[in-house]
């Protein structure tokens, strides 16, 4: 088994800043597209449709998107999942008004006929049933979460904790509610079946349950020199894969 290499929340934010700074010039949109694409690949790898009955294939991937960029990764992931033959539904209770870009991501989901539920429309709890939902993508908070959690997300996470033993949760970058550096800090807490760390795992990933949580790294967008500059080795992705199982 490979040794986990981790970067703190502070360093993760610095890496992002530099990637999107004037020297390198990635846009947030570019990185988010690759991040969301890799999460969609992880869902496919973990829950393949091949060989499944029509009933199983019709089940939903329920994507819960938070107000920041972690939520944006979820919106992108849902679009790719639709292209991959899945049946995603997005719950987006607190929409980012930060940029036009988030509205565009929602327009794209409309274009792909992926339902996007608001807090006050539709009964989102209906999707927390194993006969209806294949897995839940937790794209609520990533590396910028600062406890304690505010509503409506506190209540949403409590509901997720109730069903996580019967519907697997795929957490994007950081399991929502965990301290990025320290891991689970309150009870109940999300224990994902799958964690997709983006760029490089954060320290909290050492708290995932051994033999119960599958850990992938995704967000394949940095060259070796850049990784080394921040003190870690790049991951050995194979071929055109956007994810690597750790
Ligand atoms: N290089 C990469 O790996 C990339 C990662 N990406 C993803 O971006 C997130 C980090 O995004 P950011 O916008 O900085 O933060 P979050 O989404 O984690 O959350 C900010 C959001 O949440 C609100 N908030 C914070 N704490 C609370 C709280 N206690 N209660 C309620 N609300 C809270 C805050 O106000 C903001 O609105 C990273 O993890 C990756 O998933 C990008 O896609 C780019 C590439
Ligand atoms: K998350």
Swiss-Prot record:
Chief subcellular location: cytoplasm
Instruction: State a GO cellular component annotated for this protein.
Output: cytoplasm
Disulfide bridge map: none
Name the source's superkingdom.
Eukaryota
InterPro entries per UniProt: YjeF_N_dom, YjeF_N_dom_sf, YJEFN_prot_NAXE-like
GO MF, one annotated term? NAD(P)HX epimerase activity
A single GO BP annotation from the record?
nicotinamide nucleotide metabolic process
Domain (YjeF N-terminal): residue spans on this chain = 12-234
Q: Pfam families, per this entry?
A: YjeF_N (PF03853)
Give binding positions for K(+).
70, 138, 176
Q: Where in the cell is it found?
A: Cytoplasm; Mitochondrion
EC assignment: 5.1.99.6
What reaction(s) does this enzyme catalyze? Answer: (6R)-NADHX = (6S)-NADHX; (6R)-NADPHX = (6S)-NADPHX
Q: Write down how the cofactor binds this protein.
A: Binds 1 potassium ion per subunit.
User: What other comment is given for this protein?
Assistant: Present with 1380 molecules/cell in log phase SD medium.
Role: Catalyzes the epimerization of the S- and R-forms of NAD(P)HX, a damaged form of NAD(P)H that is a result of enzymatic or heat-dependent hydration. This is a prerequisite for the S-specific NAD(P)H-hydrate dehydratase to allow the repair of both epimers of NAD(P)HX.
Against HAMAP family, the record matches this protein to: NADHX_epimerase (MF_01966)
Official protein name in the record: NAD(P)H-hydrate epimerase
């Amino acid at each position: 088994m490979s040794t986990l290499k981790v970067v703190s929340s502070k360093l993760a934010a610095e890496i992002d800043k530099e990637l999107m700074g004037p020297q390198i010039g990635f846009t947030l949109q570019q990185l988010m597209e690759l991040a969301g694409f890799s999460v969609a690949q992880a869902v496919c790898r973990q829950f393949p449709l091949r060989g499944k009955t029509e009933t199983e294939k019709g089940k939903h991937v329920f994507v819960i998107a938070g107000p920041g960029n972690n939520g944006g990764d979820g919106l992108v992931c849902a679009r790719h999942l639709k292209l991959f033959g899945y049946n995603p539904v997005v719950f987006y209770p607190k929409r980012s008004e930060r940029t036009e870009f988030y509205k565009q991501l929602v327009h794209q989901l409309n274009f792909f006929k992926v339902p996007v539920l608001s807090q006050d429309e539709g009964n989102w709890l209906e999707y927390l049933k194993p006969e209806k939902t294949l897995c839940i993508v937790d794209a609520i908070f990533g590396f910028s979460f600062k406890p304690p959690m505010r509503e409506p997300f506190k209540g949403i996470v409590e509901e997720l904790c109730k069903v996580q033993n019967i519907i697997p949760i795929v957490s994007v970058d950081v399991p929502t509610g965990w301290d990025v550096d320290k891991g689970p800090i309150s009870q109940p807490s999300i224990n994902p079946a799958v964690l997709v760390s983006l760029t490089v795992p954060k320290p909290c990933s050492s708290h995932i349950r051994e033999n119960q949580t599958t850990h992938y790294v995704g967000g394949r967008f940095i060259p070796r020199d850049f990784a080394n500059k921040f003190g870690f080795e790049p991951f050995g992705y194979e071929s055109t894969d956007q994810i690597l199982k750790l």
